A protein has these predicted regions:
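HhH-family (HhH-GPD) DNA N-glycosylase catalytic core used in base-excision repair
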Residues: 1-269
Length: 269
């Protein structure tokens, strides 16, 4: 994929390896809004507007370096898709969501977002995140650990967190940005165990944090959609831990990429 970095934007040549709709609407990030001819996305106090232009796409931002990493532009997704296309079950999902890329989002933002995501839908998750931003800093950016920790359980209930309010309140007292960064050096099994030890984080949420925050490809988050997919392609099975392990064994280090193509396809059909 070819792209050019300028002072205030990235220009991406027309390609099958980048599509903002595929990327932003496949459940890996929630702080974005659809605008005319594109999307506005926020991450770690940075913002960008992605628009379609004659030659491809433009990412307009004051922090070009951040969004080059955020959209994982240096990774060869054509090569990843070629490897996954060896599996017949991946042909239609990759054709449908060919422009997906795995985002490199902020660790703390990812953790909080996916605690909020448990048994929730994307529109409601977005409303909660935007309400937290407004409450903590007037909507300027995703709240810092310090800003969120200053909120009471009642404050968290007030923005719509429901039963997740006391869970997030406790998690904020178990870990902060520095601790999450320290865990980068752990292998995926040890890191998952650390995450699951935190309040409000089960296996599926932990795997989402591993994939979208830590960039670990050797995980396969399993939710209702992926459970249905597994039963359709393989065998009736309700043990999501076993489903995840079977799919990681199958796809190896590309399991996380396979999950995103399959999730986007399954949810849309």
């Amino acid at each position: 994929m070819e792209y050019i970095k300028l002072k205030d934007k990235i220009i991406i040549s027309a390609t099958d390896d980048f599509n903002p709709q595929h990327i932003l609407e496949c459940g890996q990030i929630f702080d974005f809004k659809k605008i005319e001819n594109g999307y506005e996305v926020c991450s770690y106090g940075n913002s960008a507007v992605i628009t379609e232009v004659a030659c491809g796409y433009e990412i307009l931002t004051s922090n070009v370096e951040y969004f080059e990493k955020f959209f994982d532009l240096k990774t060869d997704y054509a090569k990843i898709k070629r490897s996954l296309l060896k599996f017949d079950m991946m042909k239609e999902p990759i054709k449908f969501g060919k422009g997906i890329r795995i985002l490199k989002n902020d660790l703390f933002e990812t953790m909080v977002s996916f605690i909020i995501s448990a048994n929730n839908n994307i529109k409601r998750i977005q409303k909660i995140i935007w309400a937290l931003k407004e409450k903590c800093n007037g909507g300027k950016s995703f709240p810092s650990h310090e800003e969120l920790k200053s909120l009471s359980v009642d404050d968290l209930y007030a923005v719509g967190l429901g039963y997740r309010a006391p869970q997030l309140y406790k998690a904020l007292r178990q870990v902060d940005e520095a601790v999450l960064a320290e865990w980068q050096n752990l292998d995926s099994v040890s890191l998952r165990a650390k995450l699951i030890s935190l309040s409000g984080i089960g296996p599926k949420v932990a795997d989402c944090i591993l994939l979208f925050g830590y960039g670990r490809g050797d995980v396969f988050p399993v939710d209702t959609w992926m459970n249905k997919m597994y039963n359709l392609y393989f065998e009736p099975l309700s043990d999501r831990k076993k489903i995840a392990q079977n799919l990681v064994d199958m796809f190896g280090d590309l399991a996380g990429y396979a999950q995103q193509y399959l999730f986007y396809y399954q949810r849309s059909h």
